[in-house]
Every structure is written in structure tokens, then in C-alpha cells.
Amino acid sequence: MNIKVFTCGGTFEKVYNPISGELSFQDSCIPNVIKRSRITLKVDFEELFFKDSLNMDNDDRLMIAHKIKIEPIKNIVVIHGTDTMVQTAQTIKEHASQDKVVVMTGAMLPYSIKESDAMFNFGGAFIATQTLEPGIWISMNGHIFRSDDVEKNKRKGVFERA
């Protein structure tokens, strides 16, 4: 089995810059996440762009949906910012083929920070792509959600059933 991993950036991919005191994007952490996870399946990785999901627009979402639609690999993980992940999932559902298992995930803290949830969420999404039926899913906080039955609770900082 092959797994495709697309990254769009989001907090998952950000790195703390000690000079500016800001979080910003550098090189993708996903190759290191895959290596540290000791994954033995074939993984095809592709960077789509590096954006905070609050800065994504409809064209970005349509581009993600198009890349998924034309991707020959049927099991796909999408790394995405958490603020608009549900919105992008709906766009994918509307515009991409429904014969693939697409699992979106992200992180509340960057992978580069020790207490991050990034590795856990990636592992959950990676395994979910191998076990779920075709559709658009979100894997966050140890749960798997259907894309049309989930919301981010910004007060608690977790994803919940809608």
C-alpha cells in the first residue's frame, strides 16, 4: 500500500524564530516526522504550499481538492491548519472524487515544540487512511470525525462532533 501525504502548512509546520519571537515557515518537517515514525510503507510526500489556514482562500481550497482528485494514490493524509480545516474538508468533499480515503490533520502546537500534538495526530491520520472507508475524514485529538460532523471548539482548543 502507498500513502500520499500533502502538506499545506498550518501550525503543524511552523517553527519558532527566537530572533523575531514569531512562528514562521521553513523547510517541511514531514520528512522528519515520517523518518522518526519508522514507517515502513511507501510514502509519497508533496508540499502544496505553506500557509496559516486563516490566510487560505477559496482558490487554495480548490487547488487542494484538484490535487486530491488527480492523485492516483487512493490513501491520502493532508496536513492543514486547524482553524479552517473543516471548511477545506467540505470543499474537498464537493470537488474531489469520493473513491479515496482522505484524512486531514493538523496540530495545535508546532511539531518543532516539544509538547506538540503533531506526531500523535499524524500517526492517527496515517493509520486511519489504511482502515477507513472512502470519504473525507478529520483526525484530531485521538478521534476520527466525518468531515460533515465535526467542528473546532476554539474555547477548548479541541475538535468535537458537531
Language-model-detected regions and their locations in the chain:
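Active-site histidine-anchored catalytic micro-motif
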Residues: 1-162
